[in-house]
Amino acid sequence: ACGKDRWRGELDDHSAHISKLSDGKLWEFRNQSRNRLVDFIRERFERQAIVSGLPSEVVEIADQVLDPDTLTLGFARRFVPYKRPDLLLYDPERLVRILTNSEHPLQLVLAGKAPPFDEAGKGLIQKWAQFIQQHNLYRHVLFLSDYDMLLTENLVQGVDVWLNTPRRPWEASGTSGMKVLVNGGLNLSELDGWWAEAFTPEVGWALGDGQEHGDDPALDAAEAIALY
């Protein structure tokens, strides 16, 4: 959806054409985007599993991880404490139940890097790696370590919902969420950065009350529960 040439010049004719598309055709586009993302992730994860020395049984299912027909959430950014990438891990057992619910299937793709000398950020990545391994959730949730522009491009085009959980007011913008929106995805984000201004129920969900609370464990717990 974010090709270059199609967005040059006047956009009025694009709006006219888009408004004529049926809901079925738009959903078809969304399914195609998700399918391409899953294919890309399977190939990327297989290489990662081999290089990282993951168990052979994990490498063997690399071409089967994730489901192209399942609601897919994405979370990709620098892993630093103020972005709270571990907010979903507040209640690990509850998250396991959500991810493995066959009646309402959901899958999660995470990607990111920690700054070179940020031990706290590295610890956040390790928490996710341990969670996935401990509960053998490779078919439902993946962490992709080789975070680059190609991976980001595929994620913003293919995920159904983009997660963003910063501690307000530290989010400067949140441009990845904007890219997801123009690719037909939805946002589930803290009311911070661009989402504080752009949020409307038609295009996603808001997390938090829009106030500044600082480093507050009680608030983190409340927002984690709301996120579930």
Identify the function of each model-found stretch:
Residues 1-228:
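Catalytic cores of carbohydrate-active enzymes across secretory and cytosolic contexts
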